[in-house]
């Protein structure tokens, strides 16, 4: 049974509660966070991927691999759970074709989208999948967004996600209530930016709406060594085939937003080569990372142990 089908029968809160336990239970299963494009049709002021720094300038459309190339390269990987992110992934025009023809050994965990494209685009995907619909209030009203979600729910399993920016936080209660009247599940992500921190009052407000998988906030002063399974059972696959251990890893490598944070700190060990290289291989052991684990998508997918670095492990 496809994961997308199973998710239909799991209540949202239960799913988020079980997420870390699932990872421990299936500790060896490979998870792939796949970024087919960093292009986006929105420019949210708070976005560290498309606006505050635009990764599409590092990975322009011309660098993106073709569907037929991806289908061959993905055969190299062991059976994996694949989650597709971006940018707006559906700006990669042949994404439905790619998803429909994924090697049978892989499972599609979900796709994130701002759901701004016509419903007909999403209908092109023939296999069951979970759609994580991102609500961006700078570009769409709640009423218009809900209308689109209800349209997509006719044939898809959909959850809605919103980022608790300082502008969004005061209205999350009303948004949650409005979504609830339409039987739409709302998931709240804390806003993560190394130049931003919540006040004590804001943290208290945030705790009312974050679920079990998002209770902890990122400490950008955390330079303690962490034994991490990224690179062994979790990778990030970028538009040109580059592979990084984690999303934080390619952010620390490419984004000037974090230049001061990582100054004089090694970041080379986040790189794993390119999936299209003949000698590409997953890491055979955990790494020890001393940089902040800033991305929730990374923490969802790895096993982390706080401990002193050991000589036998690769160190970042």
Indicate residue ranges for each PLM-predicted region.
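Conserved alpha-helical substructure of the radical SAM core
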Residues: 2-111, 118-121
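Flexible mid-to-C-terminal extensions adjoining Fe-S/redox cofactors in radical SAM and related proteins
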Residues: 14-30, 50, 247-316
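Short secondary-structure boundary/capping segments
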Residues: 24, 123, 225-227, 281
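Processing junctions and N-termini across compartments
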Residues: 34, 38-41, 222, 283, ...
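Short cysteine clusters
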Residues: 40, 44-47, 228, 241, ...
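Radical SAM/AdoMet-radical enzyme domain recognition
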Residues: 67-84, 92-178, 185
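Glycine-centered flexibility sites
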Residues: 86-87, 115, 231, 241, ...
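Radical SAM enzyme [4Fe-4S]-AdoMet core and its adjacent flexible, acidic
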Residues: 130-260, 270
């Amino acid at each position: 049974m496809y994961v997308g089908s199973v998710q239909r029968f799991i209540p949202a809160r239960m799913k988020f509660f079980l997420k870390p336990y699932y990872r421990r239970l299936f500790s060896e299963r490979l998870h792939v966070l796949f970024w087919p494009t960093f292009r986006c049709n929105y420019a949210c002021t708070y976005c560290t991927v498309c606006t505050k720094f635009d990764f599409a300038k590092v990975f322009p459309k011309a660098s993106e691999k073709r569907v037929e190339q991806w289908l061959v390269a993905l055969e190299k990987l062991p059976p994996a759970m694949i989650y597709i992110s971006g940018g707006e992934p559906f700006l990669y025009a042949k994404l439905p074709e790619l998803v429909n023809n994924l090697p049978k050994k892989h499972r599609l965990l979900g796709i994130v989208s701002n759901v701004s494209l016509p419903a007909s685009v999403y209908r092109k995907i023939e296999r069951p999948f979970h759609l994580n619909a991102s609500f961006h209030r700078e570009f769409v009203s709640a009423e218009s967004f809900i209308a689109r979600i209800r349209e997509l729910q006719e044939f898809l399993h959909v959850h809605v996600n919103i980022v608790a920016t300082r502008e969004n936080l005061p209205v999350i209660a009303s948004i949650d209530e409005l979504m609830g009247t339409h039987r739409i599940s709302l998931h709240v992500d804390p806003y993560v930016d190394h130049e931003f921190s919540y006040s004590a009052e804001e943290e208290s407000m945030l705790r009312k709406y974050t679920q079990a998988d998002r209770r902890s906030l990122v400490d950008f002063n955390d330079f303690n060594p962490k034994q991490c399974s990224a690179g062994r059972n979790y990778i990030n696959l970028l538009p040109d085939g580059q592979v990084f251990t984690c999303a934080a890893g390619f952010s620390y490598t490419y984004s000037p937003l974090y230049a001061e944070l990582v100054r004089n700190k090694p970041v080379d060990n986040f790189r794993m080569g390119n999936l299209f290289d003949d000698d590409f291989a997953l890491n055979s052991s955990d790494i020890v990372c001393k940089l902040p684990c800033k991305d929730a998508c990374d923490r969802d997918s790895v096993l982390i142990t706080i401990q002193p670095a050991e000589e036998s492990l690769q160190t970042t």
